[in-house]
């Protein structure tokens, strides 16, 4: 569903996908491999020193990686910034720059204050060109999320002005 030009990965009008939890890089690399951006041999080098497939992705526009992952919440913030920039470009150049920005975030990342601020500003600005996939599996690095937070994330985002759609990702 991403609009992009495989012959011109740097095309400014492309949709963008930002991965917040870098540990989900196998998902990203395998998807990009299906588009020819990585070979099976490169996937086999996952997390090896000097590999093109490190444990946390590093920006490589030519291969479809829009952001280097680092502190949790950073990918969420990159996506919000890109959505703001895309809105500016669309206002200036109309449909030529009609981009959709996608982000994949996780329970651990959503707890970070940088992510909270991004969520608030995106809702306040009404960024309808930003779609965020939130992996709400109630697990973070070393514990269940209920051990550190009791908030209803969907309600919080709705209060910030987001259109929230809840999907049971475990429904066979």
Q: What is the predicted function of each stretch?
A:
Residues 1-125:
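Cofactor-binding active-site loop characterized by glycine-rich and histidine/acidic residues
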Residues 21, 105-106, 134-136, 168-169:
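Glycine-rich, histidine-containing beta strand-loop boundary motifs that form or position
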Residues 38-42, 149, 172:
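General structural signal for secondary-structure boundaries
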Residues 56-65, 97-101, 131-141, 153-162:
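Gly-rich Lys/Arg/Thr-decorated short loops/hinges at beta-loop-alpha junctions or inter-strand turns
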Residues 91-97, 145-171:
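Conserved thiamine diphosphate
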Residues 112, 122-149:
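A short, conserved beta-to-alpha structural element at the edge of catalytic cores
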């Amino acid at each position: 569903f991403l609009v992009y030009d495989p012959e011109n990965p740097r095309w400014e009008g492309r949709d963008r996908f930002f991965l917040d939890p870098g540990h989900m890089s196998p998902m990203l690399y395998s998807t990009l491999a299906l588009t020819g951006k990585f070979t099976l041999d490169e996937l086999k080098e996952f997390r090896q020193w000097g590999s093109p497939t490190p444990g946390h992705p590093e920006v490589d526009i030519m291969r479809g990686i829009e952001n280097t992952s680092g502190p949790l919440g950073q990918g969420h913030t990159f996506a919000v910034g890109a959505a703001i920039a895309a809105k500016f470009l669309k206002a200036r150049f109309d449909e030529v720059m009609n981009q959709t920005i996608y982000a994949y975030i996780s329970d651990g990342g959503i707890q970070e204050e940088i992510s909270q601020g991004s969520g608030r500003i995106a809702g306040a600005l009404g960024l309808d060109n930003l779609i965020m996939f939130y992996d709400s599996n109630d697990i973070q690095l070393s514990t269940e999320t209920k051990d550190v937070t009791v908030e209803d994330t969907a309600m919080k985002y709705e209060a910030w002005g987001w259109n929230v759609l809840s999907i049971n990702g475990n429904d066979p």
